[in-house]
A protein has these predicted regions:
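The canonical Cys-X-X-Cys-His
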Residues: 247-255, 260-270
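Amphipathic alpha-helical interface segments
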Residues: 83-87, 128, 141-228, 236-240, ...
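N-terminal export leaders
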Residues: 13-34
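Beta-strand segments within the central parallel beta-sheet cores of soluble alpha/beta enzyme folds
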Residues: 97-106, 138-149
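A short glycine/serine-rich beta->alpha loop
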Residues: 65-74, 106-115, 204-209
């Protein structure tokens, strides 16, 4: 893992990375190929199975720290995916060593900075999908998305780590103050960022906004690991329920749309 970390920081060429990690050049065309009847990634150790990969209990606080630092390397989706998969590399190894951590880099800013689904949810969704069967992915990720929409970010815990200069993996100069909190009422990147900008008074280009998103990455990675640990232990129970307001909207408009988002985050109530 240490060697991989060094290469990620140095930005080595793809060919050099493949050579040093032992991944065959044939894998470069598609590190993981999905779909019925299509073989998984070819590696020196064989074929990476399409069935869920092994999961072991992880440290959620370590996930917070890794995700925060990784955000400043390649964005939010990368950060939360990296936090979980890098720890599984450390504790499980095997197939996780053949999954390129940069594959979620496209998800920054909701996907190429277009602002749809928050990249933090995209990243943890990909990680959850690696370890859980489809039915459980929907349960765990669905509950996580619901939690995201109603939770003030950054959390007090993330702010406290910053004030204590506890983000030990960061390579940038720290912002060691508590930041304003906001609740998005939406899983969308642009809604989340806009609500925080309105609450904090900072602009989208301010270092504090980037720090907000870094702490948000930590919060979401932390929560995802907590939920995955409970899922692994057989104790996970989904708790999120749509609001009465949203349920009322869906009672009339449920056949006219797909989703569980708060309707009034985009539409006027009527």
């Amino acid at each position: 893992m240490e060697e991989v970390e060094k290469m990620l920081h140095k930005g080595v060429s793809r060919r050099s990375f493949l050579k040093k990690t032992g991944v065959g050049l044939g894998v470069a065309a598609g590190a993981l190929m999905f779909g019925t009847g299509i073989a998984g990634a070819q590696t020196q150790g064989g074929v990476v199975p399409e069935s869920p990969l092994p999961y072991v209990e992880l440290d959620p606080e370590e996930a917070r720290l890794r995700a925060h630092a990784a955000y400043f390397r390649s964005g939010c989706a990368y950060a939360t995916f990296y936090a979980i998969v890098s720890m599984l590399r450390d504790k499980v190894g095997g197939p996780y060593n053949q999954i390129p951590l940069r594959m979620l880099g496209y998800g920054r800013g909701g996907a190429a900075s277009w602002g749809p689904l928050c990249g933090t949810l995209n990243g943890v969704g990909a990680a959850i999908n690696l370890v859980a069967p489809d039915a459980d992915v929907n349960k765990v990720l669905g509950d996580l998305i619901g939690w995201y929409t109603i939770t003030p970010f950054p959390s007090k815990e993330s702010n406290d780590v910053a004030v204590a200069n506890g983000y030990k993996y960061d390579t940038k100069a720290p912002i060691s103050v508590a930041l304003a909190q906001s609740t998005s009422n939406s899983p969308l990147c642009h809604a989340s960022v806009a609500s925080w900008i309105k609450e904090s008074g900072f602009s989208a280009s301010a270092p504090e906004r980037a720090e907000h998103c870094g702490r948000l990455c930590g919060d979401v990675a932390y929560k995802a690991v907590m939920m995955l640990n409970a899922w692994k232990a057989g104790t996970f129970t989904a708790t999120f329920k749509v609001s009465d307001e949203t349920a009322g909207c869906l009672s009339c408009h449920g056949d006219q749309q797909v989703g569980k988002m708060s309707c009034t985050s985009c539409h006027d109530a009527h």
